[in-house]
Amino acid sequence: MKQCICNQLTDIVEGESIKNFQGKIAYKEIAFYPTLWVTLYKCECCHTFWKEAYKATGHGEVPFLTKITLPPYATAEDLQKCMVVVREILDSKAITINEEHCQALALEVMGISYAKGGDYSSEIIKSFAKGYLKIVEI
């Protein structure tokens, strides 16, 4: 394999599947969410996370990749845990958001947790998530 190209790609690559980059990204599947048709990959060279999803069009579905930048020391499992906490808080307020917005909120909360010296445990994340969602008036 040649040097990976993760840093040369934009944050969103529309119309491309991760398999189109075989030999250019040393990807490894780390999670698959069948109800959402979303797969999470990690580049084994540079440790960049990629989310592959499909957007419905009038003539089928178009794949797209989204680069996920995690806060320092965070794992994909931490992100998933934080998304669950954020979704639980929003569900308790009868607020529904899509997966991308939930992920964005979770990444914001994780960034705050890291900046304040916290970790990514469920209790800490829940505390920061409640505070952050109040600040942004959700």
For the regions a protein language model found, what residue spans apply to each?
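Short metal-coordination and nucleic-acid-contact micro-motifs, chiefly zinc-binding Cys/His arrays
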Residues: 2, 36-39
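Cys/His-rich microdomains that often coordinate metals
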Residues: 8-10, 49-50
